C-alpha cells in the first residue's frame, strides 16, 4: 500500500468511529485526563529511548484517542472495574482485565489484517482500562463514594503531575496483568479518596497519575513489539 493510500485509510477509519460522538463530549474527552495520559505516554517512550515507538503512536494519536473516547460511552463503562482482592468486576459485567485482554487481542488481529486505524482504535480502548485502574474507585468497584468528585479534582490539576520519562515496561507480556498490577496499587490508596480532603487527594494522585502515565508507555510498547 502506498503512503498516500495508507494515510487515507487511517483518516477514513477514524472519522467513521468518531462521527457519532456528540461534539461537546468529544471535546471534553479528547481534552481530558485520558488524552493527556496518552500524550505523556508517547513523550515518556521518546525520552526513554523508544523513539520509533513514540513516533509511531504520534502518527496514530487521533485513533488512540478515539478508542479512549468510545469505551467511555454508554454501558461499556460498566466494564471498567477490577477488584484485585476478588478478581471480579462490577456486578455481572466482564471485569476490566478480561476486556483489556479482549481489546488487545482484537487490536493485534486487526493490525495483522492491515486494518491499521481500526487496530489502534481498539488499542486505545484497552489502554483506557489500564489508565482507569489507577483510580481507587475502579479498583474497589465503586460507582459512588466520591468517585466523580475525585476524578474531577484530578482532571483540573493533571498538569501538576505530568511525567516525561521513566516508563514501566516489565509488568508482563499479558495485557490483563497490567490491569491487575495497577489495581493493586490503586486500591491501597482508596482510604485517601473517601473524604474529599485536598491533602489526601494530592497524596493519592501523586502516586497514581504518574503511574498511569508510566504504565501507558509500557503498555503501548508491549503492543508495538507485537506488531
Question: What are the language-model segments listed below?
Answer:
Residues 1-113, 121, 139-226:
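N-terminal, motif-rich segments that launch catalysis or mediate targeting to/interaction with membranes
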Residues 118-140:
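Active-site alpha-helical segments that house and flank conserved acidic catalytic motifs
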Amino acid at each position: 500500500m502506498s503512503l498516500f493510500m495508507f494515510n487515507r485509510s487511517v483518516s477514513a477509519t477514524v472519522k467513521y468511529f468518531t462521527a457519532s460522538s456528540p461534539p461537546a463530549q468529544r471535546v471534553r474527552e479528547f481534552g481530558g485526563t485520558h488524552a493527556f495520559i496518552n500524550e505523556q505516554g508517547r513523550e515518556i517512550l521518546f525520552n526513554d529511548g523508544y523513539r520509533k515507538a513514540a513516533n509511531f503512536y504520534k502518527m496514530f494519536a487521533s485513533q488512540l484517542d478515539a478508542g479512549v473516547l468510545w469505551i467511555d460511552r454508554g454501558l461499556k463503562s460498566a466494564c471498567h472495574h477490577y477488584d484485585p482482592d476478588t478478581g471480579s468486576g462490577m456486578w455481572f459485567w466482564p471485569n476490566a482485565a478480561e476486556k483489556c485482554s479482549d481489546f488487545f487481542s482484537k487490536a493485534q488481529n486487526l493490525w495483522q489484517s492491515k486494518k491499521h486505524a481500526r487496530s489502534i482504535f481498539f488499542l486505545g480502548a484497552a489502554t483506557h482500562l489500564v489508565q482507569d485502574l489507577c483510580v481507587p474507585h475502579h479498583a474497589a468497584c465503586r460507582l459512588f463514594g466520591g468517585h466523580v468528585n475525585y476524578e474531577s479534582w484530578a482532571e483540573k490539576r493533571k498538569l501538576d503531575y505530568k511525567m516525561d520519562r521513566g516508563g514501566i515496561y516489565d509488568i508482563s507480556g499479558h495485557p490483563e496483568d497490567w490491569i491487575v498490577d495497577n489495581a493493586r496499587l490503586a486500591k491501597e490508596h482508596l482510604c485517601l479518596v473517601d473524604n474529599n480532603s485536598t491533602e489526601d487527594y494530592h497524596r493519592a494522585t501523586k502516586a497514581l497519575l504518574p503511574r498511569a502515565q508510566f504504565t501507558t508507555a509500557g503498555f503501548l510498547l508491549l503492543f508495538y513489539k507485537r506488531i
